[in-house]
Amino acid sequence: MHDKGLPDIPLHTSPLLNGHDDYEGMGIQDRKRLLQAFFTMLQHMPIMHHTFSYEKSDFKNDAALITRMKKDVVNLIFDNLEYLQRFDKVKVYYDDGQYIVTKSLHDAIEYALASNAVMYKDGCPKDYKLAQAADLICTLELTALKFDAKVQTKTDDRFFGAFGSFKKNYLKKIRKMLI
C-alpha cells in the first residue's frame, strides 16, 4: 500500500465504499485505488470460498432460518469433505456479529466435523487478511444480488460501473475461487 501512496488501513468494505470510519475524508479516487489494491491482494490469496444468501422474510421465524443455514453449511462441508480432510485443523473465523449466523455455523460445523479438527478464531477484520478477504467477497456477492434485482445503489455504480463492467472486473474473478 505504501508503495502506491495509499494508507495502510485494514479493509472494511462498507465504510470504504461509503467514506466512513477510517476512510472518512478520503476522496473517492483514493478509495477506488484502495479497493483495487485489496481486490488484487484477494486474487493472489490461496483461498476458496462459498457464500450463501437468504431473505429473512422467506422464513417464518429465526429458528427456521437457522435450520436452513445449518443444513446448507453441513451440505457444503460434506460435499467438500475430502478437500477439508487434507488439513489438520479447520479454522473458523467469525466475529460473532449476528446470533443467527453464529448459531448456524457452530451447529453445522460441530455436527459435520470432529471437534478436535476445528478451531474457532475471532474474525476481526483488522487482525486478519483472511477476514478482510471474506468481507470483500461478501460485499461483491451482495452487490451482484443488488444488480440482479436492479436495486444497486449510486455507490455501487460509482465504484463498480454498470453490471457488465462489475461482472467482468470483479464477479467472474471471485467466482473462479468458488469451492
Describe each PLM feature range:
Residues 1-179:
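Phosphate-ester processing/binding pockets and catalytic centers
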